[in-house]
UniProtKB/Swiss-Prot annotation:
GO terms for biological process: mRNA splicing, via spliceosome. Belongs to the CWC22 family. InterPro entries: ARM-type_fold, CWC22_splicing_factor, Initiation_fac_eIF4g_MI, MIF4G-like_typ-3. The lineage of its organism: Eukaryota, Metazoa, Ecdysozoa, Nematoda, Chromadorea. Its main location: nucleus. This is Pre-mRNA-splicing factor CWC22 homolog. It comes from Caenorhabditis briggsae. Residues 212-400 form the MIF4G domain. GO terms for cellular component: catalytic step 2 spliceosome; nuclear speck. It comes from the Eukaryota. Keywords: mRNA processing, mRNA splicing, Nucleus. GO terms for molecular function: RNA binding.
Length: 935
């Protein structure tokens, strides 16, 4: 029975009621057919209320279950909630059921169950009508059954306003599938600040969305230049919580731009050094993705993934065993695609494998060579393009992967001791942990955030301040300093050298923790000190930057001297500093000069290390040679320690530069002022001392010019001495002739009475002087001849023979003079005068003979000394040549032995490889025969 619409009901309700009335009139059965109409029994009303409660509870349970299952999707409104949809379904259901029953059963079966189906349909229609009437009573105040259950118009309109409130709820905006409508970051931060409870789901979900967007943007902006800055910004977020998002974004970014795989691998390596579990998760996901694409035969994705894995191997994130497993998998059953993928993988990580696993790389290339040879023999040949790729890979290996470096210098950011290598293989990586990509409520959110904040401060310190805030802070600091400047009246000075000790410790630890000298120089140069007078960062007592540089240079020299043996690391480091700035070069030059001044206080080990350091700096022209200008190679100005120091320096210079190059450097006229004291030319005695010193240490070749200068000086001195001797002999002969003429005049005047006696006495007195004068001129002539002959010949024996002849001639002349005087009898004063003359003449002759003997003795001594020195030099040169020849023979024998050992090992490996291949072929042949036999 249908009701007429009430005039007090709203228009929409009246339309629904009219529509229901039309449907009831069009239905095939009437309400009277239903024995359980809601107007007939109150018991049915109670059952309807209980069924309504059950349906509500089941709806709530279903909604809660759907919320737990899909937290990010809002509860969708079902179309069944509308009465209009129910009415359409109600009108459709009989025909559908009839059509299904007609299709599913035969006609006889339909006739037999006709009554039962009619009853079932009538019961379902009555049940739908009752539920429809109840919903209509709830919606329309004019259709309510009792005044007790009536509702106010405000309450009736309230359900229509609830969906609008839900649209404005930020929680529902973030629960949708795409994250809801776009919310600007400023508005999202404002919404997040308005939530006081940080452990609530709404706050954590907002934080998750913000973190996801920021990580995605940072990963997309990374490149080789801003890698460090991007890492610092990434670590500002909780990467432990968002490691799934981070790994997903890195993999997606690498897949979109495979050319930047090395950049993303460097980013992963930096994060892996601080958070190893993130690097392991990334590697595991890549391996799972590689296996999935390999099974699907997706070559493009496989090539991109193995490029990323190869660069992770280069960055020491993944172990090289993973590379070998991939190569074995690709080349075990070679195809065009697998060989192409393997060669692409080798290009990326071949340089690293050559460095850390050369034997494994050789086996891989042997397999490629075998594949190429099998391709040429068999009918099932690979594509010609793949064969060319294998040949290209062989050429790349021959060039030692020069075009494919393992790690670019700009991306080599992790120290070797900080690298953490994950030994995952293809079988271990199973679970990619995709559940980390979705949001999960954290009951201990604040505690975990505080823990990560402490970790972040340990890694990168406090968060960076924006430029505006920095300027404000700097302005505030300047104002505060300007205000506090007049107040400062006292200053505390620390004289305990604690700052110096701390600085030296820092420099020493920096040197010990550096891998090579370039890294050490970079770290030491980063230790900046302000140029102002007050230094509060490292050293409080150092007032200027130049003093800081001097202290650093002295520390480097001390570290080099303290080593047990000389280390080339310090020489290369100091050379780098000298080439960087002139201030460092001048500082090291001053230190070298001070070292020679205090060399007697240094023990032999430090002395040797410092000498080798100075020799290295001189040979590389890192410092100037003027540091040797203070060295004076004389017996008075040198000590034993100083001579040992100079000896070590020149021995190292010869070893580094060679004798010829060092000799040209020493004889260079532009550097003559640097070696004035080393090779003195002012005093022959000092020159002999320098010559003897360099000859004793086996470097007599450096003193050739000094020897020539000394020989020229000796010859010049000898010429001067000979001239003086000739002048002295001529003056002696003239004085003798004048004395003889005076004596003859006196004898003529005294004996005037006796003419015969006077004439005889005058004749006898005149004849001997004439003979003596003649003999004097002859002797002078002969002496000049003998001197010329001696200079021409330079023979000591000829000189001695001439001297003996001269002495013999003089003795014969004296004997003849004495015999003539004895033959002529003298009397009185004449006899006495002639005796005095003989005595004076004999004294002069003896003194002259003594001088000649002394000159000859000194000449013989000098010649013997020169001969002895030449013999020693010759013996030393022979010994050094023999030692060098022995060393060369040993080196040649060692190189020959190494070459033979290498050849033997290679031949052994080839034989083993050939034997292994033969066994494998034999096994394959036996297996194929067995299969053929079974078939």
């Amino acid at each position: 029975m249908s009701r007429s619409p009430s005039p007090d009901s709203p228009p929409a309700v009246r339309d629904d009621e009219e529509k229901d009335a039309r449907e009831q009139s069009d239905s095939p059965t009437s309400n009277t057919d239903d024995p359980k109409s809601p107007s007939e029994s109150p018991k049915s009303n109670r059952s309807q209320e209980s069924s309504r409660k059950d349906s509500r509870e089941s709806g709530k349970r279903r909604d809660s279950h759907e919320d737990e299952k899909m937290p990010l999707t809002p509860p969708n409104r079902s179309s069944e909630a509308s009465p209009q949809h129910r009415r359409h379904r109600e009108s459709r259901s009989p025909s559908r059921s009839r059509s299904r029953s007609h299709r599913s059963h035969s006609r006889s079966q339909y006739r037999r169950s006709r009554s039962r189906s009619r009853d079932r349909r009538s019961r379902s229609r009555s049940r739908d009508r009752r539920s429809h009437s109840r919903s209509r009573d709830r919606r329309s105040p004019a259709r309510r059954r009792s005044p007790v259950r009536a509702k106010s118009p405000a309450q009736a309109v309230k359900p229509t306003e609830e969906p609008e409130k839900k649209k404005n709820d930020p929680k529902d905006l973030l629960r949708t599938r795409t994250g809801g409508a776009y919310i600007p970051p400023a508005k999202l931060r404002l919404m997040q600040q308005q939530i006081t409870d940080k452990s609530s789901e709404q706050y954590q979900r907002m934080n998750w969305e913000r973190m996801k967007k920021k990580i995605h943007g940072l990963v997309n902006r990374v490149n080789a230049k801003n890698l460090v800055q991007i890492v610092r910004e990434l670590l500002q977020e909780n990467v432990i919580r968002s490691k799934g998002l981070l790994c997903r974004d890195i993999i997606q970014a690498q897949a979109f731009s495979p050319g930047f795989s090395n950049v993303y691998a460097a980013l992963a390596a930096v994060i892996n050094s601080k958070f190893p579990h993130i690097g392991e998760l990334l590697l595991r996901r890549l391996i799972v993705q590689f296996k999935r694409s390999f099974r699907r035969n997706d070559r493009g994705v496989t090539v991109n993934v193995i490029k990323f894995i190869a660069h992770l191997i280069n960055q020491q994130v993944a172990h090289e065993v993973l590379a070998l497993e991939i190569m074995i998998l690709m080349l075990e059953e070679p195809t065009d695609d697998s060989v192409e993928v393997a060669i692409a993988f080798l290009k990326e990580c071949g340089a690293k494998l050559m460095e850390i696993a050369p034997a494994a790389l050789n086996s891989v290339y042997d397999r490629l060579r075998a594949i190429l040879m099998e391709t040429e023999r068999s009918e099932n040949a690979l594509d010609r393009r793949i064969q060319y790729m294998i040949e290209t890979a062989m050429q790349i290996r021959k060039d030692k992967f020069a075009a494919y470096p393992a790690v670019v210098e700009d991306l080599d950011l992790i120290e070797e001791e900080d690298q953490i290598i994950h030994t995952l293989n293809l079988e271990d990586a199973v679970d990619p942990e995709n559940g980390l990509n979705v949001f999960k409520l954290d009951p201990e959110f604040e505690k975990n955030e505080n823990v990560y904040e402490e970790i972040r401060k340990e890694i990168i310190g406090d968060a960076d301040i924006s430029s505006d805030e920095e300027e404000e802070v700097e302005d505030d600091d300047e104002e505060s300093e300007a205000e506090e400047a007049p107040r400062k009246t006292t200053e505390i000075i620390d004289n305990t050298d604690q700052n110096l000790t701390a600085f030296r410790r820092e420099v020493y630890l920096t040197l010990q923790s550096s891998l090579d000298y370039q890294e050490a120089a970079h770290k030491l140069l980063k230790m900046k000190i302000p140029d102002n007078l007050q230094v509060n960062v490292i050293l409080k007592f150092i007032q200027k930057k130049s003093e800081f540089q001097n202290e650093l240079c002295a520390m480097l020299v001390d570290c080099c001297a303290q080593q047990r043996t000389y280390e080339r690391f310090y020489g290369m480091l100091i050379e780098r500093f000298c080439r960087l700035r002139l201030e460092y070069q001048q500082c090291f030059e001053k230190l070298c000069q001070d070292t020679y001044a205090t060399v007697h206080r240094i023990d032999i080990t430090k002395l040797r290390n410092l000498a080798r350091l100075v020799a290295h700096l001189l040979s590389t022209d890192a410092i100037e040679w003027k540091i040797l200008a203070d060295v004076k190679m004389t017996e008075e100005d040198t000590t034993s320690a100083g001579r040992i120091y100079i000896k070590f320096i020149f021995m190292e210079l010869v070893e580094a530069m060679g004798m010829v190059k060092l000799h040209t450097r020493v004889t260079d006229p532009t550097l003559a002022h640097c070696f004035v004291g080393m090779f003195p030319r002012t005093d022959p005695q000092d020159a002999r001392f320098a010559i003897n010193f360099f000859t004793m240490i086996g470097l007599g070749g450096l003193t050739l010019e000094l020897r020539e200068w000394l020989n020229r000086g000796l010859k010049k001195k000898k010429g001067i001495i000979d001239e003086l001797k000739a002048a002295q002999s001529s003056s002696d002969s003239s004085s003798d002739s004048s004395d003889s003429s005076d004596s003859s005049d006196s004898s003529g005047s005294s004996d005037s009475s006796d003419d015969s006696s006077s004439s005889s006495s005058s004749d006898s007195s005149k004849e001997p002087p004439k003979k003596k004068k003649k003999s004097g001129t002859v002797l002078k002539k002969k002496e000049t001849d003998t001197n010329d002959h001696k200079e021409a010949r330079g023979d000591s024996r000829a000189e001695r023979r001439n001297d003996e002849e001269k002495l013999k001639r003089r003795s014969d002349e004296g004997r003849r003079d004495r015999s003539a005087e004895n033959r002529e009898p003298r009397r009185g004063r004449d006899r006495r005068d002639s005796g005095d003359d003989r005595h004076d003449r004999g004294r002069r002759d003896r003194s002259k003979e003594k001088e000649d003997r002394g000159d000859k003795r000194s000449q013989r001594h000098d010649s013997r000394e020169e001969d002895r020195r030449e013999r020693k030099d010759r013996d030393r040169r022979d010994r050094s040549e023999e030692r060098d020849n022995r060393r060369d023979r040993k080196e040649r024998s060692r190189s020959r032995d190494r070459r033979d050992h290498r050849d033997r090992s290679r031949s052994r490996e080839r034989n083993e490889k050939r034997r292994h291949d033969d066994d494998r072929r034999r096994e394959e042949k036996v297996g194929s025969d067995d299969r053929r036999r079974r078939h």
